[in-house]
Swiss-Prot record:
One of the Pfam families matching this protein, by short name: Glycos_transf_4
Protein's recorded name: Phospho-N-acetylmuramoyl-pentapeptide-transferase
Species the sequence originates in: Chelativorans sp. (strain BNC1)
GO molecular function: metal ion binding; phospho-N-acetylmuramoyl-pentapeptide-transferase activity; UDP-N-acetylmuramoyl-L-alanyl-D-glutamyl-meso-2,6-diaminopimelyl-D-alanyl-D-alanine:undecaprenyl-phosphate transferase activity
Reactions performed catalytically: UDP-N-acetyl-alpha-D-muramoyl-L-alanyl-gamma-D-glutamyl-meso-2,6-diaminopimeloyl-D-alanyl-D-alanine + di-trans,octa-cis-undecaprenyl phosphate = di-trans,octa-cis-undecaprenyl diphospho-N-acetyl-alpha-D-muramoyl-L-alanyl-D-glutamyl-meso-2,6-diaminopimeloyl-D-alanyl-D-alanine + UMP
Cofactor(s) essential for the protein: Mg(2+)
Length: 360
């Protein structure tokens, strides 16, 4: 919205500052954090009043989790308010990439909200039907993938790029849509599974957002893209502003989510944030790099897949409990040890992922 002020830059030269993505990214970060700080307490109080018993605690989970009973969920609403408000204020609303990323965030967030609602009202960790939820996610993600492919230039827009290789492209054609949808849905559910401990998902999401903020800015800048010999994707630089808002909203939410958490993110937030990051990866043509930068999320979702698959085939469990962060709790790690050590892993993987921009 503030981009509209650029039209007055001839009369007021100071308004030229709104042309700069870096300035607006910083503004989006601060604004999103301020919105969450400002409205967070009221949202928490309202959710606590309406939810009563709060998020149900799994009976087979670590014993230390039972003290969290009564903590409200749906904290993703706080993150939503920060990201949406800040993005509308600081983002370039003429960018198709801005709208498609926000669309996925809202769509996935709505699915997560309904899932949280069912869990709270039924007081069961079993919420929305898994098949129905995945079907809706793939519809939203598939539509987003189609928009992204249509917004670019063929054959590049339907091609898959590879890290460490300058010119290697694999044109997927129409199959780009299901591939991209899989990336977006996978990212959403991977972050969702990671969100099992206070602050565990929040910081890695911010780390991934910061990493892809850099990637989006460089990919959307012809000069930097040429220098680094990465693929230039016009218009994706604007996604840095949205990702700045994600970081700001994450910082604001972490204030309330730090242990002992006053509120949980819930599927409302985790699905939305994962879907958003996945969509940015697709738009910037860094889908494979997402698996590196978001490697912690990949580990979490793979631990669940392996656990379920092996148990169905052999009746035995690979991990004491899945997702894998609960496995380490069962081994005797304290919650803070698991969270901080996983944060460190997320930062290291993000740095490795960013190194692919230069190692070509």
């Amino acid at each position: 919205m503030l981009m509209l002020l650029v039209a007055l830059a001839d009369e007021f030269s100071v308004l030229n500052v709104f042309r700069y993505i870096t300035f607006r990214t910083g503004g989006a970060l601060i604004t999103a954090a301020f919105i969450v700080f400002l409205f967070g307490p009221a949202i928490i109080s309202s959710l606590r009043l309406r939810q009563g018993k709060g998020q149900p605690i799994r009976a087979d989970g670590p014993q230390t989790h039972f003290k969290k009973a009564g903590t409200p969920t749906m904290g993703g609403l706080m993150i939503f308010s920060g990201i949406l408000g800040s993005s509308i204020l600081w983002g370039n609303l003429s960018s198709v990439y801005v709208w498609v990323v926000l669309m996925v965030m809202v769509g996935f967030g709505a699915i997560g909200f309904y899932d949280d609602y069912l869990k709270v009202t039924k007081q069961s960790h079993l919420g929305f039907s898994g098949k129905s939820r995945l079907a809706l996610e793939f519809v939203i993600a598939g539509f987003a993938a189609w928009i992204i492919m249509s917004a670019g230039q063929e054959p590049f827009s339907s091609s898959l790029t590879f890290p460490f290789f300058k010119e290697l492209l694999l044109n997927l054609g129409i199959f780009f849509i299901p591939f991209a949808a899989f990336v977006i849905v996978g990212a959403g559910n991977a972050v969702n599974l990671t969100d099992g401990l206070d602050g565990l998902a929040t910081v890695p999401v911010m780390v991934a957002a910061a990493s892809f903020g850099v990637i989006a800015y460089l990919s959307g800048n012809a000069i930097f893209a040429d220098y680094l010999q990465i693929h230039f994707v016009p218009g994706t630089g604007e996604l840095s502003v949205i990702l700045g808002a994600v970081i700001g909203a994450g910082l604001g939410f972490l204030w309330f989510n730090a242990p002992p958490a006053a509120i949980f993110m819930g599927d409302t937030g985790s699905l939305a944030l994962g879907g958003l990051i996945g969509t940015v990866a697709v738009a910037t043509k860094h889908e494979i790099v997402l698996a590196i930068i978001g490697g912690l999320f990949v580990i979490e979702i793979l631990s669940v897949i392996i656990q379920v698959a092996v148990f169905k085939m052999t009746g035995k469990r690979v991990f004491l409990m899945a997702p894998i962060h609960h496995h380490f709790e069962k081994l005797g790690w304290t919650e803070s040890q698991v969270v901080i050590r996983f944060w460190i892993i997320a930062v290291v993987l993000a740095l490795i992922g960013l190194s692919t921009l230069k190692l070509r």
